């Protein structure tokens, strides 16, 4: 029985764990991965009752993954897609032609021997993608400047890519980097530069269509190549990768890691024995020379073995090290065993460190034996003497208590070894290893028949050995042989200074005279040490090998390295003694003979060394082997040959990549001799890498053109861009939006809960005081925070003017009418129209002669408006005179008001219901009957003079209540006389002090801070309806109505500049005061 299930998902990314985010990459990350899981039934073991035993698997799953790609998002030149160009400027080689054709449609790892034209293959692929696409980016990356310069020469001098469309990015300066990425199309850079520009937004990863990676065997771990491809792959899977190397890795696991990191779909591997490449290879004669050990070395090895034998036996008895001859102690094995001891937490601390010190001593002896057997007595004694002086000095003053090591270093045999080595090294004519004799013989024989342009490179792993080789060759006193050292930039490790260590840890004394004496002694010794160094430096400069000796001590800077390579190419030096820095990444030039003074177990290093010769002319390789080096070299080369066979047998898991070119189009090869422009061909005559880089930089900046370049304006730096997948919501997303709420029924079924949307007030354009004006109209139910839990948001309704005026106990009450709609929370402003029977006399009698024009408590309010009200009622009318309340002074046509006494109720159900006998008609142009019936607001924003008042209410309010021009905040109003107009109510002493505090904010007067906070607290309690100090002042009186401050609504038609000018100057300070905690 088969069970089949198909799961489709986007490709996984290391830093994107959410499947929803991965799904947003559809448009530009066009890779689609479909995983099919097929379950096959298995035979199961059962008991006598037929029951399946526990742990038995009922089926096994067969997982099949298929990868497909959507059409590319890059813009293509369809008129050029039918052909691809292959330059015939050089000889057409079959293996190059085949690799180019495959690299155009697949991600290829090109692994061919050094000097076989990897640069030409990359240039041809770059040329065709330059022709096929529009506005895309083509990037060549290499770890060193010489390799970048080599590719620039190929692209400009072979393929003819326009120089003004190329750019070189090697320096650390980021000036105009964004502009260069946007204007150019072909780029030559180091991977670190490209990675940094991608992460800071200077380069859009979606624009990359071709990425060429040189020295691709480095694409392991966290190297820049790995991070670069990972970043691009997050946003763009429709791009081509071409990886170049001579040796992909040392084992199959390493090759698979490179394939996975670079998304390789095919490896094109060629060896020196391949049929299609062997005829293009120059002859390289390889000679393995087995050098026996000289008697002096054998004598020292024997004495060293006798001294270490007791320690070795103890390690074997404890099971720390395998039993072997003392001369065969291996430093690497001892180091591995010591690390296992430290990592084992079950071993007691005392036993652990005792065993660790035993293995550490065996490791040191192993290094001594290796140096002695492979490099000679001089290199051995340098290491031995440093370790001997370090331990004896520390043990002598009690800083070390390692008795195991003391039994070895204080052995009488070691004292004899020290005396013997000192005698050998003091003799300048003594050669400490048989390899040195062979080096002299090989050089003498080679230069005796070679021309002036012949060059030799000697490779060695250790700096001490490199300097010894330079001195050995220089002592031949042959004017035709001129050696020099070539090492890295790091300084040489200084030897242990026992004198300084003893002074540092000697008793210092507590008296002042002891301290002064010690400081004087340290200064004298420092001056003496500096003088001695200067004398040694002067002595080195007098010798021919002085520059090599100085380089071995302080390292070689990039400037010194370039100078040495330049002199080597010119012929000033014809023998270069290199460490691993010369194996790859440097354009050293043509070399006729390679001498490998030592060998390694890494086939990559061996192949890189041998690849330095036999490029343009025949070469010779001499391998000097001693001790176990022949077996180690053979094993390394056999393993690499086996690796090549496994790669050829398709033993790797390759990736399925995007073809980019539409499937229906199959470009045909068009071999063509490409005419190179004069400016492009100028790089062909440049041998120096710096000259090529300088020329390419000038081309990038437009300085090669004859016309004077227009000076670019230096504006602000472009802001950092963050590239995100398409359709991704940017910004901060609340956590609640990432969670889906579900409710479960009694049956256990889940259904999503709709998200509740809370309405918000429209953002107002008013000033701070205007917003305070709005706040006075809001009721306790106008804020969702103050509403009870049982209330619905829709039931929260604003208050009308009548509610404000009668806020203390009762509210308006109207009779219900089914024909009139209820006012919703955001209902439009309506005008309540009454009959036109009210007269000015009736209105005057209804005002109860209170002087304020405010209706008494418990009176029912009705409004009478003229039928000819125009749309201009939505705007404020001009200011009225102070005696506007006199009916005799009113003009005809003004609205009249009728007040009727009616008891009020406080029920929640009928507080905002429109009465039945009142007809609703819009007086605002945009306020239609549809707005009233549906409850929709007729506009999204309200100005300063709007709010929830009707036009008639507002007119009444302006004529009777608001003759002043600005808002007055009265936390505790004090009236000088009972029947007073609001216009002439003076500020209380407390409010006046509050205004003075606002005015003092401009001068930053700190004295008022305490008083300011106290008034702030008082104002907030009053505004929110809290208790005040004198609540009796707020109670209604018989001669007038005094309402809380938040109910006082004062308006102005023409604001006067003289009124409260000081208080309004610092609106920001008032905002900070009222909004602070």
Swiss-Prot record:
Residues 831-841 have a biased composition (Polar residues). It comes from the Eukaryota. One of its GO terms (molecular function) is DNA/RNA helicase activity. The keyword ATP-binding applies. Pfam families: DEAD (PF00270), Helicase_C (PF00271). It catalyses: ATP + H2O = ADP + phosphate + H(+). ATP-dependent DNA helicase involved in DNA damage repair by homologous recombination and in genome maintenance. Capable of unwinding D-loops. Plays a role in limiting crossover recombinants during mitotic DNA double-strand break (DSB) repair. Component of a FANCM-MHF complex which promotes gene conversion at blocked replication forks, probably by reversal of the stalled fork. A motif (DEAH box) lies at residues 214-217. The lineage of its organism: Eukaryota, Fungi, Dikarya, Ascomycota, Saccharomycotina. It is found in: Nucleus. Coiled coil: none annotated. Its EC number is 3.6.4.12. Its main location: nucleus. Interacts with the MHF histone-fold complex to form the FANCM-MHF complex. One of its GO terms (cellular component) is nucleus. This is ATP-dependent DNA helicase MPH1. PROSITE patterns: HELICASE_ATP_BIND_1, HELICASE_CTER. Residues 511-660 form the Helicase C-terminal domain. Residues 536-556, 831-859 are annotated as: Disordered. GO terms for biological process: DNA replication, Okazaki fragment processing; donor selection; double-strand break repair via synthesis-dependent strand annealing; interstrand cross-link repair; negative regulation of strand invasion. Belongs to the DEAD box helicase family. DEAH subfamily. FANCM sub-subfamily. InterPro entries: DEAD/DEAH_box_helicase_dom, FANCM/Mph1-like_ID, FANCM_DEXDc, Helicase_ATP-bd, Helicase_C-like, P-loop_NTPase. Residues 99-266 form the Helicase ATP-binding domain. ATP binds at residues 112-119. The gene is MPH1. Keywords: ATP-binding, DNA damage, DNA repair, DNA-binding, Helicase, Hydrolase, Nucleotide-binding, Nucleus.
């Amino acid at each position: 029985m088969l069970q089949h299930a198909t799961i489709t998902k986007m490709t996984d990314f290391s830093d994107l764990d959410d499947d929803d985010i991965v799904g947003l990459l559809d448009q530009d990350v066009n890779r689609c991965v479909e995983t099919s899981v097929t379950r096959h039934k298995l035979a199961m073991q059962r008991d006598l009752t037929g029951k399946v035993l526990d742990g038995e698997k009922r089926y096994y799953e067969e997982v099949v993954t298929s990868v497909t790609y959507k059409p590319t998002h890059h813009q293509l030149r369809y008129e050029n897609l039918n052909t691809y160009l292959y330059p015939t400027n050089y000889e057409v080689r079959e293996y190059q032609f085949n690799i180019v054709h495959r690299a155009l449609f697949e991600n290829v790892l090109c692994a061919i021997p050094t000097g076989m034209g990897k640069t030409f293959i990359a240039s041809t692929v770059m040329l065709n993608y330059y022709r096929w696409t529009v506005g895309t980016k083509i990037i060549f990356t290499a770890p060193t400047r010489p390799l970048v310069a080599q590719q620039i020469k190929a692209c400009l001098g072979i393929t003819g890519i326009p120089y003004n469309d190329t750019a070189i990015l090697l320096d650390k300066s980021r000036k105009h980097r964004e502009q260069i990425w946007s204007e150019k199309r072909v780029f030559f850079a180091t991977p670190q530069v490209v990675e940094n520009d991608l992460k800071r937004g200077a380069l859009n990863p979606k624009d990359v269509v071709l990425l060429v990676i040189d020295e691709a065997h480095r694409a392991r771990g966290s190297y820049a190549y790995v991070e670069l491809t990972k970043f691009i792959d997050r946003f763009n899977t429709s791009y081509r990768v071409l990886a170049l190397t001579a040796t992909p890795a040392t084992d199959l696991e390493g090759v698979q890691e490179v394939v996975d990191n670079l998304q390789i779909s095919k490896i094109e591997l060629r060896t020196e024995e391949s049929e299609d490449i062997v005829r293009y290879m120059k002859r390289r004669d390889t000679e393995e020379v087995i050098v026996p050990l000289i008697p002096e070395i054998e004598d020292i090895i024997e004495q060293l073995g006798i001294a270490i034998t007791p320690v070795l036996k103890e390690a074997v008895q404890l099971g720390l090290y395998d039993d072997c001859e003392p001369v065969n102690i291996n430093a690497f094995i001892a180091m591995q065993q010591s690390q296992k001891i430290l990592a084992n937490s079950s071993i007691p601390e005392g036993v652990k460190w005792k065993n660790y010190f035993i293995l550490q001593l065996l490791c040191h002896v192993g290094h001594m034996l290796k140096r002695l057997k492979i490099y000679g007595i001089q290199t051995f004694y340098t290491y031995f003497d440093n370790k001997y002086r370090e331990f004896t000095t520390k043990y002598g003053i009690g800083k070390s208590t390692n008795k195991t090591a003391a039994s070895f270093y204080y052995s009488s045999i070691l004292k004899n070894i020290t005396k013997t080595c000192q005698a050998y090294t003091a003799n300048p004519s003594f050669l400490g290893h048989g390899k040195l004799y062979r080096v002299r013989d090989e050089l003498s024989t080679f230069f005796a028949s070679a021309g002036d342009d012949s060059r030799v490179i000697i490779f060695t792993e250790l700096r001490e050995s490199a300097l010894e080789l330079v001195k050995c060759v220089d002592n031949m006193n042959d004017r035709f042989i001129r050696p020099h050292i070539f090492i890295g930039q790091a300084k040489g490790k200084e030897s242990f200074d026992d004198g300084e260590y003893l002074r540092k840890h000697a008793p210092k004394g507590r008296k002042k005279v002891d301290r002064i004496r010690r400081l004087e002694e340290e200064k004298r010794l420092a001056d003496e040490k500096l003088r001695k160094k200067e004398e040694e430096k002067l002595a080195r400069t007098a010798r021919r090998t002085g520059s090599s000796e100085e380089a071995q001590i302080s390292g070689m800077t990039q400037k010194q390295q370039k100078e040495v390579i330049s002199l080597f190419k010119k012929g000033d030096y014809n023998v270069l003694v290199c460490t691993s820095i010369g194996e790859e990444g440097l354009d050293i030039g043509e070399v006729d003979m390679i001498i490998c003074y030592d060998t390694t177990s890494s086939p990559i290093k061996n192949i890189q060394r041998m690849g330095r010769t036999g490029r343009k002319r025949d070469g010779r390789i001499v391998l000097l082997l001693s001790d176990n080096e022949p077996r180690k070299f053979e094993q390394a080369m056999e393993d690499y040959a086996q690796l090549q066979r496994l790669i050829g047998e398709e033993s790797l898991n390759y990736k399925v990549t995007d073809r980019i070119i539409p499937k229906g189009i199959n470009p045909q090869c068009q071999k063509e001799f490409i005419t190179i422009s004069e400016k492009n061909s100028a790089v062909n005559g440049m041998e120096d890498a710096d000259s090529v880089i300088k020329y390419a930089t000038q081309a990038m900046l437009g300085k090669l053109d004859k016309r004077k370049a227009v000076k670019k304006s230096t504006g602000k730096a472009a802001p950092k861009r963050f590239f995100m997948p398409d359709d991704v919501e940017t910004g901060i997303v609340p956590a609640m939006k990432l969670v889906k709420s579900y409710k479960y029924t009694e049956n256990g079924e889940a259904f999503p809960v709709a998200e509740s949307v809370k309405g918000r007030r429209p953002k107002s354009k008013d000033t701070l005081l205007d917003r305070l004006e709005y706040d006075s109209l809001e009721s306790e139910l106008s804020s969702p925070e103050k509403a009870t839990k049982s209330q619905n948001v829709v039931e929260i309704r604003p208050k009308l003017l009548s509610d404000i005026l009668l806020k203390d106990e009762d509210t308006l009450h109207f009779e219900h009418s089914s024909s009139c709609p209820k006012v919703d929370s955001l209902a439009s402003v309506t005008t309540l129209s009454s009959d036109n029977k009210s007269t000015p006399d009736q209105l005057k009698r209804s005002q109860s002669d209170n002087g304020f024009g405010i209706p008494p408590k418990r009176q029912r309010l009705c409004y009478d408006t003229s039928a000819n009200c125009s749309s201009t009622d939505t705007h404020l009318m001009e200011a009225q005179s102070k005696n506007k309340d006199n009916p005799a002074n009113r003009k005809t046509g003004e609205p009249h008001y009728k007040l009727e006494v009616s008891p009020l109720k406080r029920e929640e159900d009928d507080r905002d219901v429109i009465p039945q006998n009142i007809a609703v008609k819009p007086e605002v142009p945009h306020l239609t009957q549809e707005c009233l019936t549906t409850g929709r607001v007729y506009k999204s924003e309200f100005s300063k003079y709007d709010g929830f008042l009707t036009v008639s209410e507002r007119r009444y309010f302006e004529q009777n209540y608001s003759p002043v021009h600005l808002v007055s905040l009265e936390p505790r109003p004090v009236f000088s006389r009972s029947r007073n107009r609001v216009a002439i109510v003076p500020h209380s002493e407390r409010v006046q002090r509050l205004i003075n505090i606002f005015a003092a904010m401009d001068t930053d007067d700190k004295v008022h801070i305490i008083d300011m906070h106290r008034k702030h607290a008082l104002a907030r309690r009053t505004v929110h309806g809290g208790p005040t100090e004198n609540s009796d002042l707020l109670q209604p009186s018989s001669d007038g109505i005094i309402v809380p401050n938040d109910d006082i609504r004062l308006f102005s038609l023409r604001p006067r500049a003289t009124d409260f000018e000081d208080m309004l100057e610092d609106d920001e300070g008032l905002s900070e005061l009222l909004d602070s905690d």
